[in-house]
């Protein structure tokens, strides 16, 4: 039967042996160390004084790390057991009574967690697509990695020399990466599977890099960035090469958003315009004119919202769900949110915020649009009621609310089974698997997680 050490490669075995010998030496167990050297057939040169210093304390750190991991696993197993028990005892009636229908869930105060560690304003938050991991980027030049389920800080990632302006998880299916961009003119790729090691730094922009996103595709090959240098750039993830530069804006580009299928790019800028681009050809397709100040944010509407937006647009039937760029939403420093069709026609202006709009997110089920603003609030706009604001989370933060993300969850198609709406099955419906979790960041230096 194989022992665990047999699964280690030679380099890992050497490191383990050196760590054990260093532990014996530090513990005064010289005879035991000598016996192990003899058993291994190695001399003093295997672990000289310099190497000894390097490996001192390694074994203890690994041991305490394993204990912490075991504790976390036990906590998660306990929570999983509790949630499974709740699920097993739930009925359609109880689910409806408790108002946990995911398609209608909206955030409410108080937040589930307030994550505190940053020392300056927070500019961006991003959810890991699989695990309960949340990243936040700040003016303090750091990235913080949190377990949003437990509300705990896992690590601080350092590397940028100026403010971290945006973050995103994505990339190749073989291994999810984290990308960040900064006022230091760089974009950095980090590997979550290797302690968030910086694996690549992308340079090429001539001014602050405002926004960055992985472009969705089967291979996860590319990412796109927006900059104060008035350009968008498309980069190859594997090499870090810039493969495309897109020009057209006449001022600082504040935001960029790819469509869910990666075919289109949407950019918003200080020139008060939003622009639609073909991602593969860089061809400009449409310009959205109507805001009276800087456009801070832009987002594509998901197909789940098409029926509601089609009604607002006065269409007899919604566009096909296979299309990825039928409607968009933009938020501006003019304190308004605007809804548009893909041709640049303004459909609706949503008024209610008392300060700059900083970020937008569509509810995955398509019924609502959420926004955060420098007025410190989260507002929820009901697209089935002509975009009426149906909920406001007042004082969501104690300072400007700067960023917003909805935790991702995959859509599932029910073909031979039954879908459920408000806990009541309906045959042949599409089920949107909504994760009822959002995160917001603020100039108050806190990240808040709102969850059901």
Swiss-Prot record:
WD repeats lie at residues 117-158, 160-200, 204-245, 248-287, 290-350, 352-391, 396-435, 437-452. Its main location: cytoplasm. GO terms for molecular function: dynein complex binding. Belongs to the WD repeat LIS1/nudF family. It is found in: Cytoplasm, Cytoskeleton; Cytoplasm, Cytoskeleton, Spindle pole. Self-associates. Interacts with NDL1 and dynein. Keywords: Cell cycle, Cell division, Coiled coil, Cytoplasm, Cytoskeleton, Microtubule, Mitosis, Repeat, Transport, WD repeat. The gene is PAC1. It comes from the Eukaryota. The keyword Transcription regulation does not apply. The keyword Repeat applies. Pfam families: LisH_PAC1, WD40. GO terms for cellular component: cytoplasm; microtubule; microtubule associated complex; spindle pole. Positively regulates the activity of the minus-end directed microtubule motor protein dynein. May enhance dynein-mediated microtubule sliding by targeting dynein to the microtubule plus end. Required for nuclear migration during vegetative growth as well as development. Required for retrograde early endosome (EE) transport from the hyphal tip. Required for localization of dynein to the mitotic spindle poles. Recruits additional proteins to the dynein complex at SPBs. InterPro entries: Dynein_regulator_LIS1, G-protein_beta_WD-40_rep, LIS1_N, LisH, PAC1-like_LisH-like_dom, WD40/YVTN_repeat-like_dom_sf, WD40_repeat_CS, WD40_repeat_dom_sf. Residues 64-91 form a coiled coil. GO terms for biological process: cell division; establishment of mitotic spindle orientation; microtubule sliding. SUPFAM superfamilies: Lissencephaly-1 protein (Lis-1, PAF-AH alpha) N-terminal domain, WD40 repeat-like. Dimerization mediated by the LisH domain may be required to activate dynein. This is Nuclear distribution protein PAC1. Residues 12-44 form the LisH domain.
């Amino acid at each position: 039967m194989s022992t665990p050490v047999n699964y280690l490669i030679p380099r890992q075995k050497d490191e383990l042996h050196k760590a054990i010998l260093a532990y014996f030496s530090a513990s005064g167990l010289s005879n035991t160390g000598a016996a192990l050297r003899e058993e291994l057939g190695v001399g003093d040169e295997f672990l000289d004084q310099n190497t000894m210093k390097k490996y001192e304390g390694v074994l203890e750190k690994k041991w305490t790390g394993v204990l912490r991991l075991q504790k976390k696993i036990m906590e998660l197993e306990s929570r999983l057991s509790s949630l499974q028990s709740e699920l097993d005892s739930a009925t359609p009636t109880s689910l409806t009574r408790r108002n946990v229908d995911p398609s209608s869930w909206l955030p409410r105060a108080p937040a589930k967690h307030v994550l505190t560690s940053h020392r300056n304003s927070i500019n961006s938050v991003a959810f890991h697509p699989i695990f309960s991991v949340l990243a936040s980027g700040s003016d303090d030049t750091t990235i913080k990695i949190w377990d949003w389920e437990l509300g705990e800080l896992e690590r601080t990632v350092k590397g940028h020399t100026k403010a971290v302006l945006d973050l995103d998880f994505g990339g190749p299916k073989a291994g999810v990466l984290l990308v960040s961009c900064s006022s230091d003119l760089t974009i950095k790729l980090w590997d979550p599977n290797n302690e968030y090691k910086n694996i690549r730094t992308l340079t090429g922009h001539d001014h602050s890099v405002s926004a960055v996103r992985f472009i969705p595709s089967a291979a996860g090959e590319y990412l796109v960035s927006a900059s104060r240098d008035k350009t968008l750039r498309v980069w190859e993830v594997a090499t870090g090469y810039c493969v495309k530069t897109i020009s057209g804006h006449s001022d600082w580009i504040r935001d960029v958003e790819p469509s869910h299928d990666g075919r289109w790019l949407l950019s918003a800028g200080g020139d008060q315009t939003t622009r639609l681009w073909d991602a593969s050809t860089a061809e400009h397709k449409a310009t959205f004119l109507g805001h009276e100040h800087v456009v801070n944010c832009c987002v594509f509407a998901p197909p789940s919202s098409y029926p509601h937006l089609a009604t607002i647009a006065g269409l007899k039937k919604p566009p096909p769900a296979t299309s990825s760029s039928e409607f968009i939403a933009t938020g501006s420093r003019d304190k308004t949110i605007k809804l548009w069709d893909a041709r640049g026609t303004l459909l609706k202006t949503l008024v209610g915020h008392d300060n700059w709009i900083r970020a937008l997110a569509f509810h995955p089920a398509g019924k609502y649009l959420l926004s955060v603003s420098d007025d410190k609030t989260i507002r929820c706009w009901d697209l089935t009621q002509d975009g009426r604001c149906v909920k406001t989370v007042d004082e969501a933060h104690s300072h400007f609310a700067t960023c917003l993300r909805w935790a991702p969850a995959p859509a599932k198609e029910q073909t031979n089974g039954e879908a459920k709406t408000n806990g009541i099955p309906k045959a042949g419906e599409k089920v949107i698997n909504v994760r009822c979790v959002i995160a917001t960041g603020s100039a108050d230096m806190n990240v808040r997680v709102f969850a059901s």
